[in-house]
Amino acid sequence: MAEQKSTNMWNWEVTGFESKKSPSSEEGVHRTPSSMLRRYSIPKNSLPPHSSELASKVQSLKDKVQLAKDDYVGLRQEATDLQEYSNAKLERVTRYLGVLADKSRKLDQYALETEARISPLINEKKRLFNDLLTTKGNVKVFCRARPLFEDEGPSIIEFPDNCTIRVNTSDDTLSNPKKEFEFDRVYGPQVGQASLFSDVQPFVQSALDGSNVSIFAYGQTHAGKTYTMEGSNQDRGLYARCFEELMDLANSDSTSASQFSFSVSVFELYNEQVRDLLSGCQSNLPKINMGLRESVIELSQEKVDNPSEFMRVLNSAFQNRGNDKSKSTVTHLIVSIHICYSNTITRENVISKLSLVDLAGSEGLTVEDDNGDHVTDLLHVTNSISALGDVLSSLTSKRDTIPYENSFLTRILADSLGGSSKTLMIVNICPSARNLSEIMSCLNYAARARNTVPSLGNRDTIKKWRDVANDARKEVLEKERENQRLKQEVTGLKQALKEANDQCVLLYNEVQRAWRVSFTLQSDLKSENAMVVDKHKIEKEQNFQLRNQIAQLLQLEQEQKLQAQQQDSTIQNLQSKVKDLESQLSKALKSDMTRSRDPLEPQPRAAENTLDSSAVTKKLEEELKKRDALIERLHEENEKLFDRLTEKSVASSTQVSSPSSKASPTVQPADVDSAGTLPSSVDKNEGTITLVKSSSELVKTTPAGEYLTAALNDFDPEQYEGLAAIADGANKLLMLVLAAVIKAGASREHEILAEIRDSVFSFIRKMEPRRVMDTMLVSRVRILYIRSLLARSPELQSIKVSPVERFLEKPYTGRTRSSSGSSSPGRSPVRYYDEQIYGFKVNLKPEKKSKLVSVVSRIRGHDQDTGRQQVTGGKLREIQDEAKSFAIGNKPLAALFVHTPAGELQRQIRSWLAESFEFLSVTADDVSGVTTGQLELLSTAIMDGWMAGVGAAVPPHTDALGQLLSEYAKRVYTSQMQHLKDIAGTLASEEAEDAGQVAKLRSALESVDHKRRKILQQMRSDAALFTLEEGSSPVQNPSTAAEDSRLASLISLDAILKQVKEITRQASVHVLSKSKKKALLESLDELNERMPSLLDVDHPCAQREIDTAHQLVETIPEQEDNLQDEKRPSIDSISSTETDVSQWNVLQFNTGGSSAPFIIKCGANSNSELVIKADARIQEPKGGEIVRVVPRPSVLENMSLEEMKQVFGQLPEALSSLALARTADGTRARYSRLYRTLAMKVPSLRDLVGELEKGGVLKDTKST
C-alpha cells in the first residue's frame, strides 16, 4: 500500500487502497495520474554514475516540458469553451433584460395613466368632503363638561339634547332661571375621549386633504382642557389620536407615486413672547416661519415618521416647558403638525397644517384683586383670548375685516383661522355651582364666537311648548320602534325555536353516537394504558438489569486490573528471588567444584543441591503458569466485546489463507475473496449508494440511545477532580456505547449507531486534546462506524488491503529501511513496489540459558540445545508500546484492522511470528504448550499496541481511524455526485418529440437537481464524518452548466408549447374573424421570435408544433368583422354542439328576494368545453331541462349588450339572469365570474381555468 504525502492542496482521490499490481501487469495498463507529481526510477547499475544522473535529469525535464504543454493545450481549450458559453449566456441574458425593460416601460406608462385618471377623482372627493364639513360654516364650537369631584357639590348643568346645554342660574328675579345655549355638539360628563375624537376626526381628514385646521381647548383652569388635549395613559387625548389618525389616513392614501411627510413644531406664548420648546433638543433642526408678515417667527421643526417618534418629541417639549403650574395657567401651548404631500407624476405639492392649541385659563377675565406680575400675565391672557373671540365672531358673521392684529396669538395662527381653513373650539366647563360665573362667562364667550344669542325670558313659553312637542314626538317614535322591534323579536324567536328543536334532535342523536364512541375509546384506552404500563415495567426492569450488568462488568474489570498489578508485583519479587537463587547457586557450584577436587567429599551432597534447585525451578514454573492463565483470562474478557461486534462479519466473510513469508514479491497478496472485506447488504443492481444517516434526516430514537446521547452531551470534564477521574468517566461512557450496540444486535446495530453518532464524535473530539481516553475503546467505536459505512456502500467493499506481513519486519533483513543504527524496534520505512509502508520491526533474539536452567534441564533429561525462548512481562510491555507508537497516524494499518476480522488478524500475526522466529516454533519435544502461549502473548501484545495506536490522536489531526472514515465518506459522496452527473448528462442529451416527453424530461432533470442539492446539504451538515480545515467543501462538485442550460431550455419550451396549445384550442372553431385570425398568427410569430432562447436540441420540437398550429390557423376560413350575420350570434357559431357529459355536478343559486332558488348542472364534453343543464324557464321548473354548451368569456369581447342578450336568449334563463347587467362591460365581468364558478366545479376544467386566468381571458373588472 502507498501512503500519500501530506500537502496543502486538496486531493479528491482516496489513496492507499488501490489494488496491488505486479510490475509485468502494470506495463500494459494505462493509469490516469491523480496529481501533478511523477515518480521516475532508473537502475543504478544500468548507466555510469555521471551519465545516468545527467540522463535522468534530462528525461525529467523533457517529461515536465511535455506535461506543461499538455496542460497548456487543455487549459486553452477550456478557456475557449468557457468563452463561447459565456457569450451565449450573455446574449440570452441581454435579450431577457430587453424584454424586462419593455415590460417595465409598459407598467410605468400604465401607472401614469392610472394616476392621471385617479387624481381628478381624489380631488373631487376632497372638495365634496370639505363642502360637507363647511355647510354650517368654517368655525364650529363643541362644549364638554367634566365629571364632578366629591367635594364640589351638585351639578347645575342639564343636557336636553346633543346640541343644547341648560344652566340653572338660581336667579329668582327671572321668570325662568334656566338659560340655554346651543352649540354644534355638547358632551356630558359620561362621554370619553374616543367619542369626542369621532367628531373631531373630520377636521383631521380635512387637514390631510390640504386645509389648515386649528383646534382650541378653551375654559377655566381645572375644567379639563389639558386632559382633553393630552389625556392619560389609558385614555389618550387629541394629540396622540390626531397624529395616529393622520398616519393611518396617509398609509391608506399613499401610492408608489405619492407620499406624505410630517414634521412637528411645539412652542408656548407667554406675555406675548414666543418660546420654542424644541430648540434645546437638537441644535441642527430645520427651521420654519409662522405668522403674518409683520409678526413672522422662526421655529424649529422635527420630522416624525410614526406615532412613537411623535410622542417622544412631544414629551421632550413638555420637559423643556417645565412644571411651573402658576406659569402654565397663563400660557398658551401650541402644537403644530406640518403635513407635506407630494406626487411625482402630477408634480403636485400640497402643504397644510394642523394646530392643536391648549389656551390659558379663562378665569383671568374676572379676576380683579390680583396685583404685580401676575396681573400683567392675566391682562395678556385676557387680551389674547378676547382677540381670538373677536376673530372667530368676525369669521362666523362673515365681516369684511378680520382683526388679526389685536393679538400676537391671532397673528401667528392667522393662516389657520381665515379663508378656507377650519376652526374648532372645544369649551370645557366645570358643572359645579361654585363656578357659575366662570361657566356663564365661558358659554357667553363661546356663543359670541359661534355668533349665537342665548334664549331670553320672553321666549321661555315658546321654548317650553316646543320641548313638550319634541318630547312627545320622541316618545311616539320610540314606541313605534319598540313595537317594530318586539314584532321582529317574536318572529325571530319562533324561527329560532323551530331551529332549536331541529338542533336538539340532531344533538341528541350526536350525543348518543358520541357516548357509544366514547365508551369504545375508553375501553381501548384502558387496554392500551395497561399495555403501556406493562411495557414500561418490562423496560424499566431491563434497564435496571443492564445497569447492574454494566456495574458488574466495571467492577470485574477493576478487580482484574488489581489482580494484574498484584501478579506483576509477585513476578518482580519472584524474579528478584530467582536472581538471589542464581547467585547462591553460582556460589554453591563454585564450592562444589572446590570440593570435587577433594576425593573425600561425598557425591550425594551435590545431588541434594541439584534437587533443591530443581524444586525452586518447579515453583517458578508454577507461578509463571498462573500468571499466563491470568493474562489469558484478561485477554479473553477484553476481546469478548469486540468479537461480538465482528461476529456478523466473521460469519459472512471468507477465511483468509495465511500469508507465506516465502511467497514471491510479484504475486498479488490478496484478491477479492481474501481481502477481508465486509459483505454487502445492499442491492448492487441499481448502483444505489447510502451513507449513515445524517443529522438532518429523521432518526429513530430508543430509550438507550436517548440515555447515551444525553450522557455524552452532558459529560463535563470540569466537574471531575484529576485526570484519573476524567479518564474513568470517559472510558465508562465508551464502554456503555459498545454495550448498547451489542445489546441492540445485528438487526438494529445501524439504527443505534446512527442515533448516537453525532454525540459520540462530538464527545471524542472534545476529549481528544486531554488524552485521557482508552485509545483501544476509541478504536473499537471507530471501527463500528466504518464497518457500518462499508456495509451500506457497495463501492467501498471492493477495496483491497495489503496482508499483515507487509506491516511486520524481522531485524537485520534485506529490506530497504532507514539508516538508523538503533537495534530497538521502531518505524522503518519499507517500499513495496509502488507503495510506501512502514514496517514494524519485531526484535526477538534467543536468550542464553543460565547455568541453573541448564542443570535443571540435564536433571530432567532434556537436551541442552533444544531450549525455548522465555518472554518476560517487561518485554511484552516494550513490544506493545513500540507497536502503539508504530500505529499512531498509520492509515494503511487502520484499513487493515477495518477490513480484517480481529481473530483472523491475530492468527496471521501468530503465523508470521512462528515462521519468522524458529526458536518460538512448536517442536516434538515441546509438549508443555509453553511455546504456543508465548506466540499468543506476542501476537496479543502486537494487536493491542496496534489497536491502541490507530485510535490515538496526533493534534491537530484526529486518529488514523477517524482520518480513514473521512476518506471513505468522501469517496462515497464523490461516487454519488458522479452518478447523478452521469444521469443528468444522459437526460440532457435526449431529444423531446412532443409536449409529454418535454414534461417528462423536465421533471426528470428537476428531480436529479433536487437530489444533487440534497446530497450537497447532507455533505455540509455531516460534520461528524469529516475532519476538514477552514470549512472547505469535502467533495468537488461536478459542473452542471450543460444540464442547467438544458433545464432552462426545457422550461422555456414547455411555456411555448402551452401557448401553442392554447392557440390551437382557440382555433378549434368553424370560422374566425379577420382580427382574431390576425391576432393568432401574430402570437405564433412572437413564439417564433422566442426560439433563440432554446437550445439547438429543442428547436425541432418547438418548430414542429408552431408550424402545425400555423397551418391549422391558416386553413380556417375567415370573415369580415362587421358582417350583418355577426350581429346575430348563435351558440352553434361560438361553440361546438357536443353535449355528451359523463358526470354532472350540481350547483344551487339563490338570488335573494321572493324568487325561489334554481339549480344548474354543469359538466365537460370531450372537447373540454363547459356544458350546462337547467330549466329553460325559471318560473316553469317542470317545463323540461335543456342542455347547452356555454361559450367562453372571450366570445363576448367585441359584442354589444343587445348581441349578448341574443346569445343568452339561446341559453337557459337561469344563466342569463345571473350574467346580464345594465352595461356590456358589466355583463362581461359578471359572465367571467359565473364561468369561473361553473368551470371550477368540474374537475377536468380546473386546469383550463388556470390557463384562461394567466392569458387574461377571465377578468373580474370591466374590460377597457
Curated annotation (Swiss-Prot):
Main location: membrane
Coiled-coil intervals, chain numbering: 53-84, 462-511, 545-592, 617-640
Null mutant phenotype: Impaired chloroplast accumulation and slow avoidance movement under strong blue light. Double mutant kac1kac2 exhibits an increase in leaf transmittance and a partial defect in nuclear avoidance response under strong blue light exposure.
Basic and acidic residues biased stretches: 18-30, 589-600
Amino acids binding ATP: 219-226
One annotated GO biological process: nuclear migration along microfilament
Cysteine disulfide partners in this protein: none
Cellular location(s): Cell membrane
Matches recorded under Pfam families: Kinesin
The keyword Coiled coil appears for this protein: yes
Stretches assigned to the Kinesin motor domain: 138-452
Tissue expression summary: Expressed in roots, leaves, stems and flowers.
GO MF, any single term: ATP binding
Bias (Polar residues) ranges: 1-10
InterPro entries from the UniProt entry: Kinesin-like_fam (IPR027640), Kinesin_motor_CS (IPR019821), Kinesin_motor_dom (IPR001752), Kinesin_motor_dom_sf (IPR036961), P-loop_NTPase (IPR027417)
Chain intervals with Low complexity compositional bias: 652-668
UniProt superkingdom: Eukaryota
GO cellular component, one term: plasma membrane
SMART domains, per the entry: KISc
Region (Disordered): 1-52, 588-615, 652-684, 1117-1136
Keyword terms, alphabetized: ATP-binding, Cell membrane, Coiled coil, Membrane, Microtubule, Motor protein, Nucleotide-binding
Family affiliation: Belongs to the TRAFAC class myosin-kinesin ATPase superfamily. Kinesin family. KIN-14 subfamily.
PANTHER family assigned: KINESIN-LIKE PROTEIN KIN-14A-RELATED (PTHR47972:SF22), KINESIN-LIKE PROTEIN KLP-3 (PTHR47972)
Stated role: Kinesin-like protein required for chloroplast movements and anchor to the plasma membrane. Mediates chloroplast movement via chloroplast actin (cp-actin) filaments. Required for the chloroplast avoidance response under high intensity blue light. Mediates redundantly with CHUP1 the nuclear avoidance response under high intensity blue light. May be involved in division plane determination.
Subunit structure and binding partners: Homodimer and heterodimer with KCA1. Interacts with CDKA-1. Interacts with At4g14310.
Protein name in the entry: Kinesin-like protein KIN-14B
Organism: Arabidopsis thaliana (Mouse-ear cress)
